[in-house]
Amino acid sequence: MEKFIESFCASNIFFNFVKIFPMPDTLSQSQRSYCMSSIRGKNTKPEILVRKGLHARGFRFRLHNNKLPGSPDIVLPKYGVAIMVNGCFWHGHKGCRYATKPKTNVGFWETKIARNRHRDEVTNAHLEALGWHVITVWECELRGKSILASRLDALAEEIREAGAAKSKLKELYKRNRAESKMALREVMERQAQLE
């Protein structure tokens, strides 16, 4: 019986069935706890789909960079891009049919999802303040092969645009720095002539 529960809880059938047919909890507290513990935060199916798609399009990246706020799922330092791959339920995707609220323990889930959304907003703001371009990819955007392909193409384009913007900023910074050095040199030369 335990083997059956383990395989059932780990399958996508369980999650899809519960979303379509909400029902009272038929599992014991320990069984429910086991099912919930099998839900991962890293290397999720949507995250792997995005990684495979980006790799196939020629991008190279870092995973779960814990030196950045919020440990973004995918980081492309060359382009200055941090990608968050969010599950619609766990991150409270507004207007999404997959972001349903559980029927039991409603207060707990509303508070938890609200906290998750607030944490995401703070993390994104912090990353942007550090100069990163933050892209959020939602789980629902990756459902279906044609939708997945078009979303990954759009994501690749957004990454390239962010990289171009980063290059322009670097060039401006270098130019301004060079101009500042020249201006400082001129001021020092004038000062030396006056002495």
Residue ranges and their predicted role:
Residues 14-195:
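Nucleic-acid endo/exonuclease domains
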